[in-house]
Amino acid sequence: MAIKKSELYSSLWAGADSLRGGMDASEYKNYVLNLLFLKYISDKARNDAKNNTYSAIEVPQGCFYEDILALEGDKEIGDKLNKIIAEIAERNDLKGVIDSVDFNDNTKLGEGKAMIDALSNLVKIFADLSLGAHGALDDDLLGDAYEYLMRHFASESGKSKGQFYTPSEVSLLLSLLLGIDENTRQDKSIYDPTCGSGSLLLKASSLAGKNGLTIYGQEKDISTTALCRMNMILHNSADADIAKGGSSTLSNPFFIKNGMLQAFDYVVANPPFSLKNWTDGLSIDPKSKQVINDSFNRFEDGTPPEKNGDFAFLLHIIKSLKDTGKGAVILPHGVLFRGNAEGAIRKNLLTKGYIKGVIGLAPNLFYGTSIPACVIVLDKENACARKGVFMIDASKDFKKDGNKNRLREQDVQKMIDTFNALKEISHYSKMVSLEEISANDYNLNIARYIAAKQESEKDLFALINSHKASYLPKNEIKAYAPYFQVFKGLKNTLFKRSDKEGYYALKIECENIKDLITQSSEFQAFHASVLNAFDRLNLFETFDHLEPGFNPKTLIESVCSKVLKEFEKVEILDKYGVYQLFKDYYNEVLQDDWFLLSFNDFLSAKELRKLNPLKDKNKKANYLEEPDFVIQKTYYKSDLIPKNLIKQRFFEKEAKELEKLENALNEKEADFEEFIEEHSSEEGLFYELKINESVLKKELKNATDLEDKRNPKNRFRIARS
């Protein structure tokens, strides 16, 4: 049976949480993700066998997920899980990938019964998850679930251990900046020299249509490399070439052809910021401070500072691009303006025309650091003819998400639209000529070229009320010029000249302003233009004809593209703000229902989903979701139809009777509380009736009558005697 995405996420995270104990998130994530991987390959193999199609992963008999579920409560569950994983690894060249996690480690999972309960509960988390039978829809479901887990693990892992994950919004931004779309051919190659869990590579490949791109990646951390390889298989990219971990890309690059670095069509990267030991494995001349043993000529434009590897990664990426190659790399903001050796390298790269664009991002977007970062967009094609660098200041574009900042969909879309069109927007974007950059000593600090926008009060009513008078500063009213261009008579209707220099005077009372605006013909025309734009989206017709198997993500992207097109025609409205409203509504309301409809049409409305509890150490049932109905002590959830509608349609009489009884109970409880309060005062009936457990035990102990001790009804009499 299909399950809501949001409920899948909460179940997965609850499973991870139940396992964590004293483990760090960087450790317990491996147990959860390994089991998700085992569930996926098991379901995929079953479905491939059923459809007589090729399966990239062989699952031996006795190693399917139902065999794992059968281990629930087994005293040797940890050891037997290890053996199942070892056999799958042996058959599929996955040694060192999926068998690096020890499911029999009592230092992490507890001893004896504690381990048995923890693992039994964990394997049950994935029991109801069905993967592999619905093609692309399952890929979306699994990919989003994996992304959800990775983001939460990164958030919980702390500063030094969250760098394996690049936020999905940033991954999407980099991929779109490269111009990858459904028309990009599968033989186009993409490379990430610091690939972490592979999220950047997979996001870029997913944009290239059904067959994706040819993927290459290298990661130094061995456990993260294993995570990356699993991630590739989970996302139908089992043939991705991921180098075995353990060696640095800078000192020991894996992808070499004919003695030179292999060149790729696209490169994406989010390398560790300001790496201090980047020279490990390389030799630096103590006098010239130049690398003297790099056979790949990566440092011909200069050697970065010995204690800061930002430009070392950038130079490696440039050398790894084909002559027509394109790249996008995340680096700390300091690479734009730091001087000395880095300034010289930056000048050389700009002179050669390799840097096409620079985008300043908000601070605190990444899990490994809170410092501001930027995107360096590289393009070797037509580099010799490049006359400038396109800059975007998106440092104010984000939303708060716990203790981190996140890019919104509207932020990414605005950056991409602006960059692709090379559109100059006041306080946001600008094409800066190389002559101007040269005049600034090749400093790329965005603030030198794009003036920050002064924040002003957006609410006219709040502005007027804040001054608590009939006078308003002219310089503050200027901020509303775009509105006065649409509502042309509004300014003269609201304000008049005053006897106070630099101020306007109000013509009308403050409390009448809102009615005056909303009742004006200009506002009515504006309101009509908004409704007309909405009508042109044809949403009701679109949503009334949803066929089973439709792709919810594709549909919402199509709708949001229309939103941008239609609301561009509406003056003063921010089309990206409207775009975000649709995205938020989809994420918070529509996507769960759409996925259910896509999987099962309206069959999901005919069924209640049984909730399976986890058992705590006392064998008490623990449910991960709140039930909608309890029938003979069994808990059920209605996924598609709200429970209140079911009650109204099928249990109207019972619901009214229940409501009547609940109201009566509430009245009696209120009367009882009032009675207790009234008679607990010094002169009340209960003043001397001080009964509690200790008093009762004491009185019973002192009682001489056996009947008093045996009969609870006598307790009040004993206590008051």
Placement of each model-derived feature along the sequence:
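Hydrophobic alpha-helical scaffolding
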Residues: G112, G135, T194, T214-D221, ...
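Conserved S-adenosyl-L-methionine
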Residues: S160-A269, F273-Q290, S295-D301, F311-A312, ...
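Hydrophobic alpha-helix feature that most strongly marks membrane-spanning transmembrane helices
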Residues: G209, I233, S237, P272, ...
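Non-catalytic, mostly N-terminal accessory regions of nucleic-acid modification and defense proteins
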Residues: M1-E182, A240-F254, G360-P363, M391-D393, ...
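Conserved Class I SAM-dependent methyltransferase catalytic core
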Residues: E7, S11-A14, S18, E27-F37, ...
